[in-house]
């Protein structure tokens, strides 16, 4: 039995890589598309047009096709990016008039796009009822909406939540038990016994944050000279002792299954899901029990889809946000072309019923709630440029 080579997944969380090719069948060249949009823009309402800048999954026919049927004649375009900052830079570079929706990881809306007036708030009367039906991590009666979906003052709703998941590291539980991996956490990779027995999934931005966890301090602060030096030594050791480094999660999952490695650095439910779906349940995303960020040693991500501050915003943008709340569309987003993730709407019986036992096992539903509870949100790293330069040097010069 071999693992399907689903190449579309390879750059899903590789925030530092350059934007790659666009999804087959829905692909278009960004520069030419931008030119066409500017040429076609009028002062009238764009009822028959919608342009979406997103992570892969939302740009698939499983998601877009039903929306086209619901809004006959709509000119619907979706471009997938491979890192959040590059997508934000499109808006900064003058493409506010191009895009209607932007789909990014949780920290960017309130920390950058909202202060820079790149997005506008959602109608709370329309969208809060949908949020109130989500899993408790994203809405509960006591605390309300997850703060990453709100403006810093808590008054404005900045986007809708859907896909999410823990993201720390992955092990073969036939070689390293789940209990051992959760107990040891990221320092597991510094054990001399693991030399040449692990891989590194080269998702650079995640690697930088996870190296901070490995070194024993939070990524989400400006670091002291002593911490920077410890980061350097930790990065050097990680790369020097790794058996393989690859941006291809399928290759790393295959190495786990074949016994070439016992675990890989940076990964989670998302990267393990396709292997698990094909029957390799020993491939498991791990969320450590403890760590340096308020006692937590694991991380998670979720996406927020926001309305762009387009001066001629399409009214179909808000319609799309509501459309993807439908149970069948929630399922399509969750399992779009091999991109296997849980979605926040799975608290609803009608959505949950769409998932088979095999699919629930693929996304590690059995432990998802507890793993999310001990995971910290992905956030902006203040001195990311410095740490990334050290990281890149350690990777380049590994011996």
Annotate each predicted stretch with a short phrase:
Residues 39-112:
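Early extracytoplasmic/lumenal segment of secretory-pathway proteins
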Residues 303-371:
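Mature extracytoplasmic/periplasmic domains
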Residues 97-102, 120-170, 197:
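A structural signal for short loop-to-beta-strand junctions that line the ligand-binding cleft
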Residues 365-399:
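Conserved C-terminal helix/tail region of periplasmic/extracytoplasmic solute-binding proteins
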Residues 10-29:
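N-terminal export leaders
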Residues 199-203, 207-211, 219-287:
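Ligand-binding pocket segment of bilobal, Venus flytrap-like solute-binding proteins
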Residues 1-14, 35-38:
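N-terminal secretory signal peptides
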Residues 113-122, 154-156, 274-290:
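Ligand-binding "clamshell"
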